[in-house]
Amino acid sequence: MLEKVFQEITNKRKFFASSSTGEQFENQFRNELKKHFSEINGDLTEELSHIEEKPNKEIKTTFNQLKKQVLEKNHPHTLKNPFSNLTSHFLYQPFGSQNYPDFLVFIFDYVVGIEIKFSKNDKGEKNLQTSRPMWNSNLPKPNAIYVYGVANANITFFKGSDILSYETREVLLKYFDILDKDEGSLKNALKDLENPFAPYIRKAYEHKRNFLTTTRLKASFRPTTF
């Protein structure tokens, strides 16, 4: 079923690329998902409990375990679906509007996180020479699918593992873990001193590759896996 979603996006590339805002782009993808999956709304625990026919407490425990797996920074494999009856459903912003993922899709035996990335194109250029999604402080997760669009230009999609290897991700994560510890040591050293400045060390990642002219990425996701 997810294969059909991405096939439709491929067939309607111009339509999806016609979005002028990130919100519009995200809503178009959401509407496409609704054609093939049932969206779970309302109280999450109650809805899942009803679908699974299990008590709320058991549902909460199972979902919290799944959440930890979904948010794991370097989980190399597609996640197994812990729910038996959630086989064609999805959640929108399951962990909040500012948190990964934008969509959590349940497909038979698997659970897939999907994140939407969008870049503005104020000049309305049709053939952009360079275009890169913003990653801020989060590296692409290996088992996630990313849908990236540039306003009025183009759209592509890929898995996190297609653009960053497990080994490279591990090196980056370990490095920034060290920085986090160093920041803690700095704050501890300053806590008893008169100091008008609060140190704020912000990690950020910038992708060096041009996404919309990289044909390998356009064909990198093979939705038949799901």
Feature roles, as predicted:
Residues 87-104, 124-137:
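Catalytic micro-motifs at enzyme active sites that drive phosphoryl/nucleotidyl and oxygen chemistry
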Residues 77-96, 221-225:
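Short N-terminal helix-initiation segments at or just after the protein's N-terminus
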Residues 100, 111, 141-145:
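Extracellular structured ligand-interaction cores
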Residues 123-124, 130-226:
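Acidic, metal/cofactor-coordinating or nucleic-acid-engaging core segments within structured domains
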Residues 34, 38, 118-121, 151:
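Hydrophobic/aromatic-lined pockets within catalytic cores
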